[in-house]
């Protein structure tokens, strides 16, 4: 059995009410308090709008959920309620539903986001350090509260660059961590799926989020989005193996006694490890430093137990400047 290196017993030690989302009784607010202004996005499970609270004229985000199991909606609500007020976690303000269709909507705080495809290419070396550090605060917080996000990717990280404000959003795939529990491997978005998901290791943990963060970070520093560009789940593992090498993959599979299905094994083939510096070029060299490479190398590990935890990541030399700036601000 594989078990998280940190925060493994959070839900064991908390009362059942904390993690038993199926028992949640939803307190519905008043739908007429909110009006849709414009559509800002759509996902597999929802449509997202900029809205307005007509009582105080404040902007908000309205996430109208597509028909999905009641249990899944309750899970998302319970997790958002448990995490509310945590650093850089999007705030759930209200839950409403349509009187006739019974379609539920989640009302969130408004964040003025710049699309990452536009924003990321403009970010400086320091900006990347700053925003990854802000994202780590959100991840360490949710992990410390016994919750894995399971869908970390640029689309789910809202950045208001003018205010230098970051929010981790879309908790629809998030789940409570219970040691030894076997989870669905059909989570996360393909380019950000950890090796554990791609080889069907089900007793994964918070460290899945650290792989996804590593993919996101690699994309940012090497200006290569997405960093691992697989065409399907099998090809995704192939793309990872072509960078990390197949020797490490085999060590990982043997350690956890995992057998790849023969078709996937044939596809993966044999590859040597590609040094990180091979991804450096004239366009990205100003973002690639020895500390950045060292940090990346400690995230993108096949073995989920070897990856840095979010808290360990925050102490990495890569963030030294960010920590120093934060300390001088708190002292000021």
Swiss-Prot record:
Residues that hold ATP according to the record? 40-48, 63
Record's catalysed reaction(s): L-seryl-[protein] + ATP = O-phospho-L-seryl-[protein] + ADP + H(+); L-threonyl-[protein] + ATP = O-phospho-L-threonyl-[protein] + ADP + H(+)
One Pfam family of this chain: Pkinase
Q: Which residues form the signal peptide?
A: none
Q: Which UniProt keywords apply?
A: ATP-binding, Kinase, Nucleotide-binding, Serine/threonine-protein kinase, Transferase
One GO BP annotation of this record: DNA damage response
Protein purpose: Casein kinases are operationally defined by their preferential utilization of acidic proteins such as caseins as substrates. The alpha chain contains the catalytic site.
Name of the protein described by the UniProt record: Casein kinase II subunit alpha
């Amino acid at each position: 059995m594989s078990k998280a290196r940190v925060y493994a017993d959070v839900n064991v030690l908390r009362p059942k009410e904390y993690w038993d989302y199926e028992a949640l009784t939803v307190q519905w607010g008043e739908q007429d308090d909110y009006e849709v202004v414009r559509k800002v996005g759509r996902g597999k499970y929802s449509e997202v709008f900029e809205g307005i609270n007509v009582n105080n004229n404040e902007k908000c985000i309205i996430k109208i959920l597509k028909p999905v199991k009641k249990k899944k909606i309750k899970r998302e609500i319970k997790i958002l309620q448990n995490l509310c007020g945590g650093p850089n976690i999007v705030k759930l303000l209200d839950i409403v539903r349509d009187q006739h269709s019974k379609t539920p909507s989640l009302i969130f705080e408004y964040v003025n986001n710049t699309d990452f495809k536009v924003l990321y290419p403009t970010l400086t070396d320091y900006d990347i350090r700053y925003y990854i550090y802000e994202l780590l605060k959100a991840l360490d917080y949710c992990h410390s509260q016994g919750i894995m996000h399971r869908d970390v990717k640029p689309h789910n990280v809202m950045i208001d660059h003018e205010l230098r404000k970051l929010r981790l959003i879309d908790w629809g795939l998030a789940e409570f961590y219970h040691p030894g529990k076997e989870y669905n491997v059909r989570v996360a978005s393909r380019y950000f799926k950890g090796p554990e998901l791609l080889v069907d290791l089900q007793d994964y943990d918070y460290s899945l989020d650290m792989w996804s963060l590593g993919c996101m970070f690699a994309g940012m520093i090497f200006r290569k989005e997405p960093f691992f560009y697989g065409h399907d789940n099998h090809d995704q593992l192939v793309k990872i193996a072509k960078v990390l090498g197949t020797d490490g993959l085999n060590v990982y599979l043997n350690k956890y006694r995992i057998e790849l299905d023969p078709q996937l094994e044939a596809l993966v083939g044999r590859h040597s490890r590609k040094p990180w510096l091979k991804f450096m070029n004239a366009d990205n060299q100003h973002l690639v430093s020895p500390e950045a490479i060292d940090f990346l190398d400690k995230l993108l590990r096949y073995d989920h137990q070897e990856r840095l935890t979010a808290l360990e990541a925050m102490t990495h030399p890569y963030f030294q400047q960010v920590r120093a700036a934060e300390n001088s601000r708190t002292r000021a």
